[in-house]
């Protein structure tokens, strides 16, 4: 079965940005409510977490649209939202990073050494490295998500860079796993059912894994879409 040719855009209409903003805010406030149900009321702590979770879900939607469009042609009309969702996910990692540096010393003061304020970050170096790689790769992709990006790189290299967004999602998964909550908190909840809903890490991880599973299925069924693209010499002339 031949893969559907995808459509890339370098600018979006205002309604697309509005809808994307609504989607992001819907995820954000849903997880604010979700944490409240789990006896974690609205605080700087939940704000930081839900900012990141909403970003991860927007990235998940952006990544899922490509494979879905190759399985179901009805999704082709939604492909322009890959850009708005992806850029929103990337830009909203900025307040997440800022909030991390603000709230961590307040939330976990016992984890910080009086003599060395970066002790928590050293102790959790892998978590920090995965977060750092996520942020840096996100920003690189953002820089080249404009018309000048494809002119500088050529179509094929540009498409390869855009596909590295899946690597961003893998970094996010590793970032989550390195926090030590998975599967420990899941098992604890299954044993106690002390809250009406599972830990927030459960729906977050499922949301992150879904587009990766879809991409693997897409590669198995349709092959790599890059193989169908002509070389840069033909594209950038």
Segment roles from a protein language model:
Residues 2-237:
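Membrane-embedded alpha-helical bundles that constitute the cytochrome b-like, heme-associated redox core
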């Amino acid at each position: 079965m031949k893969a559907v040719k995808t459509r890339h855009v370098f600018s979006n209409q205002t309604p697309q940005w509005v809808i994307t903003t609504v989607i992001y805010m819907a995820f954000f406030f849903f997880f604010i409510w979700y944490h409240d149900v789990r006896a974690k009321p609205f605080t700087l702590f939940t704000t930081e977490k839900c900012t990141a979770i909403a970003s991860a879900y927007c990235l998940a939607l952006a990544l899922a649209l490509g494979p879905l469009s190759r399985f179901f042609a009805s999704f082709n009309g939604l492909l322009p939202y890959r850009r708005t969702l992806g850029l929103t996910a990337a830009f909203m990692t900025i307040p997440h990073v800022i909030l991390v540096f603000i709230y961590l010393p307040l939330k976990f003061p016992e984890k910080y050494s009086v003599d060395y304020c970066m002790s928590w970050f050293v102790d959790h170096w892998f978590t920090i490295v995965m977060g750092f790689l996520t942020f840096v790769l996100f920003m690189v992709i953002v820089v080249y998500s404009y018309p000048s990006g494809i002119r500088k790189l050529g179509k094929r290299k540009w498409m390869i860079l855009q596909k590295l967004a899946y690597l961003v999602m893998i970094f996010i998964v590793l970032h989550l796993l390195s926090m030590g909550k998975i599967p420990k908190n899941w098992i604890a909840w299954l044993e106690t059912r002390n809250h009406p809903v599972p830990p927030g890490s459960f729906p977050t991880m499922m949301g992150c894994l879904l587009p990766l599973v879809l991409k693997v299925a897409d590669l198995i069924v349709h092959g790599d879409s890059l193989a169908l693209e002509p070389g840069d010499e033909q594209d950038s002339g």
